[in-house]
Amino acid sequence: MTKPTILTGDRPTGKLHIGHYVGSLQNRVKMQNEDKYNMFVFLADQQALTDHAKEPELIRQSVGDVALDYLAAGLDPEKSTIFIQSQIPELAELSMYYMNLVSLARLERNPTVKTEIAQKAFGESIPAGFLVYPVSQAADITAFKATHVPVGNDQKPMIEQTREIVRSFNNAYHTDVLVEPEGIYPENEAAGRLPGLDGNAKMSKSLGNGIFLADDMDTLKKKVMSMYTDPDHIKVEDPGKIEGNMVFHYLDVFGKAEDAEQISEMKAQYQAGGLGDVKTKRFLLDVLDRELSPIRERRIEFAQNMDYVYDMLKAGSLKAQAVASQTLDEVKSAMGINYFK
């Protein structure tokens, strides 16, 4: 029986933070180790350039950083094909063919794209590459005939757009070459979109409100001790709110089964009064360090041998290119533009 194929990846615009870890990376490692899937994991550097075209040095540095984060978190190049998007030219060619099947109006209606355009404040200067990046995503997914794509709930419109492109292509060219993917969405809503340390809905490097997998213990401690809690909880004896309190939100996400009873007791005590923010933050620091210290240590080890990291990326890219090339041949054959045998 053929294994389902998983495609997943990240835009390399900086080091990965713990929101990436609980939102997707942790689950990728789990699926990889189950040995039930063909796993493709990629660094979407071309997509990153759609809104960082004048910062190629940032993208180049980030490719290495994200690759380190992948390896440190447990992705294994023996079990997952890890590759760089720009090193697979077949993806750009597939994108060109798919763009002919999607209207500009449909791209502009994509809710995810509309939200991101507003967030980035492009105004009237929206890069064309950014507007059409859902088509590029469709090329990424279909090139490897991915059956399943793990994404956040905010990416559902992207999966649906890919499915539309697949149906449009297969209908137009009377073929079944392309596979309609299914999205895999987070089961844990709290982990699916981890807020920033300051309570902002989004954790990001630009907002300075994230904990990164590469952060050392001193940095982690400073960030945890500065976290947003209940602004009205001034004295230890004051009753406090746990809703919107980032310390308790993070404890819900990162706490293990063995922590559940203590977390429950802390919530009750905090709400009744008698538990200070410093104590809750120290407990969270221990919980986070338990999770992150092995990742941090592995990352330091891999960073000492970047030749290995780039050799791994090169090997993965060559392996991925062979698969994408086969799909492109099938696509061109279906379209009738395979002129030379």
From Swiss-Prot:
Enzyme Commission identifier(s)? 6.1.1.2
A GO molecular-function annotation? tryptophan-tRNA ligase activity
* Binding sites annotated in the UniProt record for ATP: 11-13, 19-20, 152-154, 194, 202-206
Q: Which CDD domains match?
A: TrpRS_core
Q: What is an example of a Pfam family matching this protein? A: tRNA-synt_1b
One GO cellular component assignment for this chain's record is: cytosol
Q: Where is this motif: 'HIGH' region?
A: 12-20
Tell me the compartments it is located in.
Cytoplasm
Q: Which UniProt keywords apply?
A: Aminoacyl-tRNA synthetase, ATP-binding, Cytoplasm, Ligase, Nucleotide-binding, Protein biosynthesis
Residues forming the motif 'KMSKS' region are 202-206
| Top-level enzyme category | ligase
Which residues are involved in binding L-tryptophan?
140
GO process terms (BP): tryptophanyl-tRNA aminoacylation
Query: Which reaction is catalysed here?
Result: tRNA(Trp) + L-tryptophan + ATP = L-tryptophyl-tRNA(Trp) + AMP + diphosphate + H(+)
Q: What does this protein do?
A: Catalyzes the attachment of tryptophan to tRNA(Trp).
Q: Which family does it belong to?
A: Belongs to the class-I aminoacyl-tRNA synthetase family.
Q: Subunit comment for this entry?
A: Homodimer.
The name under which this protein is listed is Tryptophan--tRNA ligase
Q: Which organism is it from?
A: Lactococcus lactis subsp. lactis (strain IL1403)
